[in-house]
Design a protein with these regions (language model features):
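Active-site catalytic loop in hydrolytic enzyme cores
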Residues: 82, 86-88, 92, 108-186, ...
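Conserved hydrophobic/aromatic positions in well-ordered beta-strands
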Residues: 10, 121-123, 246, 267
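Cys-nucleophile CN-hydrolase/nitrilase-fold catalytic domain and related Cys-dependent amidase chemistry
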Residues: 21, 33-125, 194-196, 200-210
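N-terminal phosphate-binding loop and adjacent alpha-helix
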Residues: 13-30
Length: 318
């Protein structure tokens, strides 16, 4: 469905109730109510908002046995079945508010416990529209999350337009982006944990490359958000995720809202989806400016199995 109208969107930068999925979902419902009151039809919430992102500031400790079993158990207990009752709560909020939402969760499989997934959900008044599992957990995330399969790389048709996107550093994967671009996203959701300047530059590039409005939303995680009985020792710092929510338009990659740092908050912007059509008149990465006929044949055959990170070179003792 190609929608050519103005859609009001909300980038909701928020702090989860860490290791409490039920309380985090209740908070998400309140935040969606705030977004609806502001007139938003679509809201985007952060990566693994329900209900813990394994930050590289402390996640390395999970490679030891000190506290790691307890953390893993509590993460699993505070993760989300998809579909499941917590998803149903969010869908009920979408239905009552007449909204769509993209939200990041830690997904579990209750019937087959043992692996969690970094998952992105598309929800709306009609229910669970789609889910995508992160293809490649980043560095420290591999202590917690399994890898995705890739058959869920899609843009979803809604009455807010076609909504595509990827999770955090998946957005750095050119072929993953291209796979979604081919489905014509008009709005690109990028839940993330990256609060760097380089990330925002990348979001601007994706807006230009895709011809879509980009909504990127990290968490804001102050030290005070962690429960007193958090199983791992936290390093001495006050903030573990500084935010940086941003909305970017598709013609020249201009930032139209944000970036928002150092606090919880919400960015609201009216996205004129006709701008994506105008942008693609000049550059359509998967249409008139694509040369699949030339470039696809230059790609080597993909390996049958995912590549592992090579081990470090062994140093012989002197």
């Amino acid at each position: 469905m190609t929608v050519l109208r103005t859609v009001r969107v909300a980038a909701i930068q928020a702090t989860p109730v860490i290791l409490d999925a039920e309380a985090t979902v209740r908070k998400a419902v309140r935040l969606l109510g705030d977004a609806a009151q502001a007139g938003a039809e679509l809201a985007v919430l952060p990566e693994t908002f329900v209900s813990l992102y394994p930050s590289n500031a402390w996640a390395h400790q999970a490679a030891t046995f000190s506290g790691s079993d307890e953390l893993w158990e509590r993460m699993w207990l505070s993760s989300v079945d998809v579909p499941g009752p917590l998803v149903d709560e969010l869908v009920a909020a979408c239905r009552s508010l007449g909204m769509h939402v993209v939200v990041g969760v830690n997904e579990r499989e209750s019937e087959r416990p043992g692996t969690l997934y970094n998952t992105m959900l598309w929800l709306g008044p009609d229910g669970l529209l789609h889910k995508h599992r992160k293809l490649m957990p980043t560095q420290h995330e591999r202590l917690f999350h399994g890898i995705g399969r890739g058959d869920d790389l899609r843009a979803v048709s809604t009455d807010c337009g076609r909504i595509g996107g990827l999770i955090c550093w998946e957005n750095r994967m050119p072929l993953a982006r291209y796979a979604v671009y081919r489905q014509g996203p008009q709005i690109w959701a990028a839940p993330t944990a990256d609060d760097s300047d380089g990330w925002i530059a990348h979001m601007r590039a994706i807006a230009i490359e895709s011809g879509a409005f980009v909504i990127s939303v990290p968490q804001y995680i102050p030290r005070t958000a962690f429960p007193a009985d958090f199983p791992l020792a936290l390093p001495e710092r006050d903030v573990f995720g500084n935010g940086g929510a941003v909305i970017v338009e598709p013609t020249w990659g201009q930032i139209v809202a944000g970036p928002l740092y150092g606090e919880e908050g919400m960015l609201v912007y009216d996205c004129d989806l006709r701008l994506g059509l105008h942008a693609k008149r000049l550059f359509d990465a998967v249409g008139h400016y694509s040369r699949d006929d030339v470039l696809a044949g230059l790609l080597p055959a993909a390996p049958a199995e995912p590549r592992d990170t090579p081990p470090p070179a062994r140093t012989e003792p002197a």
